Amino acid sequence: MKKGSKLILILLVTFFACLLIFPTLKWYFLMSVEDKKISSYSQEALRDYSKKKALNDLVKLKELYNKDPNSSIPASLSYLIPIAKNNYRSSMKIPPNIFTAKTLREGFLTDSDMGEVSLEIYRYYENIKKGKSRIIHLGLDLSGGMSVTISLDYSSVEKKLGRSLTFAEREDAIYRIMQILKDRVBRFGLTEPKIVREAGGNKIFLDIPGEKDESRVSTLLSGKGNLTFYVVDDESTSLLHRKILEAGSLFSIPEIQASMNLPDSKQIFPWYVKDSYGVDDESSVRYYVVDASPENSFDGAHIKDAGVSNDPRTGRDTVAFSLDVDGSEKFFKFTQKNVGKSLAVVMEGKIKSVAGIGYAITGGNVSIQGDSFDKKEAQDLALVFKTAAFPVDIKIDDLRIIGPTLGARTIDLGIKASALALCLVFLFICVYYGLSGVVAGFSLVIYNVFLILAILSAFNFTLTLTSIAGLILTMGMAVDINIVIYERIKEEIREGRRFENAFEAGFKKAFLSIMDANITTFIAVLFLTLLGTGVIQGFAWSLSVGIVASLFSSLIFSRFILEFIISVRKSKFISISWSSKYAKSN
């Protein structure tokens, strides 16, 4: 490869590596602890925080205006300026070039303006949360938290079906359980977890950083879910709506329910409209009375699968789901008895959808067509059907709590050990190989580590003590690459070749040996990556990425630097040993 091509390749790789590693650097070194904490809130908690902060900041702006209308805008309120500019333009006004308390205050005159501020705050933290999918995370041994190993038990389902589950059915069950766990973790407001499955196995590993309450996690994992179909009591629902109107804005559902003298079998559930934050809007809710008696309800645990389809006759999106054999028969009797009535889909005490029963449904294939379904709403409802209940039984095989003190201690020791190892490697190669060693040390200890961390960031890698060990081992292997190259160059010099020729021949003849050794190691590591679990997989991942980065750093980057140094030196020579024999040109 020509020097120009090498330079272009190095610049491209470095540019993309900078893009990949920036989110990690931003998260750990540029972002405040407060922002990190807030970004881990659940959607509901983040919405409430955004509204509260928007209100407080607008109050601060008003106080600033009352104190001195011409005062400058503090940094904490500077995020309001772009919103104010949009408000000026929406009012057909020209925004000022420089904002003061007076001009900024004039950009927020209506209640809807506060909503815009709240949304801007919400989007800011949502973007931080999304950015976490592109950073290197600290494992539980470094950050502390809880580690849970979950195994799947297919026996009860297979006994019920009278046959063994197919490979596709098992894979679907694992996928659905992982989706359920993600959904439940978000509802419980826990820190974003790491949920991975055992390669080729029936285990799921759930790591929750910072969590120490065993009872909360046990509650999260307990139960199969409670998606239920209820028949709507239209007469009682109409009465409920009238009483809500009579009571006005300060109505109380428990008081209204008591005044209606409803029997125990009749229950009231809310149906929330999603707000602009994508969460339930407390101010936009409609209540329904349902008949919760066993004969007028259907257990959603019978749902096998769900998806979104399009009705060719109406062009509307529909949510279709299929039932197991037992559920098909029960659902037929259930719908046959209630033709012409409304059906409410209830999960976690909230109505997810209401649809009419047009006819008795046979065959276990059901479709729901809402009057105002859009694609997103249909997909959300399908996900509710798929993830409401664990499709198979689960059990906790192992639950471990790692304290933050241990995490802090292991971080400190890990950083010290890594730094010491890198310094010793750098010192050795510099002393033994002279200026060539300095170039190799820079390319391996600095550029190589930079590439490895950039690649691991792209894969949302979780850094553990074992993966750190893999990185240190990678440094040693990278040094081996340069040792092979330099020793080969020295052999060529001993055979009487000029340095320029020995340099080219050394790299060329060492190439095959280097590739053979690293490809062999990479194949072994690849199997550990695919088949290993937990700490073994983390070690294998860091080692495999390190091999690729080390080859590029040694064969492309360090060679280009050496060639550049040689080209600008009059002697056309560079030291490759502490020995005077190789310290001057032939």
Curated annotation (Swiss-Prot):
Cell compartment(s), UniProt: Cell inner membrane
Keywords from the UniProt entry: Cell inner membrane, Cell membrane, Membrane, Protein transport, Translocation, Transmembrane, Transmembrane helix, Transport
InterPro entries per the UniProt record, alphabetical: Acrflvin-R (IPR001036), MMPL_dom (IPR004869), SecD (IPR005791), SecD/SecF_arch_bac (IPR022813), SecD_1st (IPR048631), SecD_SecF_C_bact (IPR055344), SecDF_P1_head (IPR054384)
Annotated GO MF terms: protein-transporting ATPase activity
TM stretches of this protein: 7-27, 418-438, 439-459, 465-485, 521-541, 546-566
One cellular-component annotation, GO: plasma membrane
Gene Ontology biological process: intracellular protein transmembrane transport; protein targeting; protein transport by the Sec complex
Lineage: superkingdom: Bacteria
Disulfide bond entries: none
Subunit structure: Forms a complex with SecF. Part of the essential Sec protein translocation apparatus which comprises SecA, SecYEG and auxiliary proteins SecDF. Other proteins may also be involved.
Purpose of the protein: Part of the Sec protein translocase complex. Interacts with the SecYEG preprotein conducting channel. SecDF uses the proton motive force (PMF) to complete protein translocation after the ATP-dependent function of SecA.
PANTHER family: PROTEIN TRANSLOCASE SUBUNIT SECD, PROTEIN-EXPORT MEMBRANE PROTEIN SEC
Family statement drawn from the similarity comment of this UniProt entry: Belongs to the SecD/SecF family. SecD subfamily.
Protein name (record): Protein translocase subunit SecD
Species, as recorded: Borreliella burgdorferi (strain ATCC 35210 / DSM 4680 / CIP 102532 / B31)
Top-level taxonomy: Bacteria, Pseudomonadati, Spirochaetota, Spirochaetia, Spirochaetales
